Amino acid sequence: MGKLRQIAFYGKGGIGKSTTSQNTLAALVEMGQKILIVGCDPKADSTRLILNTKLQDTVLHLAAEAGSVEDLEVEDVVKIGYKGIKCTEAGGPEPGVGCAGRGVITAINFLEENGAYDDVDYVSYDVLGDVVCGGFAMPIRENKAQEIYIVMSGEMMALYAANNIAKGILKYANSGGVRLGGLICNERKTDRELELAEALAAKLGCKMIHFVPRNNVVQHAELRRETVIQYDPTCSQAQEYRELARKIHENSGKGVIPTPITMEELEEMLMDFGIMQSEEDREKQIAEMEAAMKA
């Protein structure tokens, strides 16, 4: 067994990050890799396609029931899923109460201290990326995750979140070993999406690892709480995830310290691609619409 690789999938909520990560990890386990998934998203949906179940009980929830995290055994919080993948969910507090990142910190420390990281080739963190607050940045900040893969699309907010996550990586890159592995574009069928993803990757100084095409088979598999790899292993989408897994596997040690851009540069890039209008164009369009309404 080689050196443990600690990777993380970051991305804005609703981008398909958990789906992408679970399908990729299912493909990695087919390649003979031993994997532990640590879900760090308050939705706690980072393992359901691997376990083929409803949401897994979280470390925080189980700790609250048991009295404290010290009262738990690893077997209580780690479940075994597809082809032996180990799964755990950190969890978070009730909405509006406390810091969701606290669960991430508690869970990772508990898992490490109790041997959950032994005998695996990969630990994969699935992390919410709209907010790179202290808690959610914890896998980066505490030098746990070494390679970050940002799941994004051609939509403006996904690009904005990707750039923000790159800023978070840059902040901790010099003090720790964290690097940006690259971007994964989840197709949303927006205009010039692949070009835009490649342009952002170039600005950030990283690779566009893979462009995952949109395919309804993903939703069909999700309804059965399965990855595409398990649901329809011979379909073209399963091959896309295998290709993505291969690229990540071969990307070891090739991460970069990113070069995030300013909001102005991001808006300029969107204007160049015709995604966003300039202030003058916008005002002109509003004036034309108002004139048409009066006519």
Curated annotation (Swiss-Prot):
[4Fe-4S] cluster binds at residues 99, 133. Transmembrane segments: none annotated. Its cofactor is [4Fe-4S] cluster. It catalyses: N2 + 8 reduced [2Fe-2S]-[ferredoxin] + 16 ATP + 16 H2O = H2 + 8 oxidized [2Fe-2S]-[ferredoxin] + 2 NH4(+) + 16 ADP + 16 phosphate + 6 H(+). ATP binds at residues 11-18. The modification ADP-ribosylarginine is found at residue 102. GO terms for biological process: nitrogen fixation. Belongs to the NifH/BchL/ChlL family. This is Nitrogenase iron protein 1.
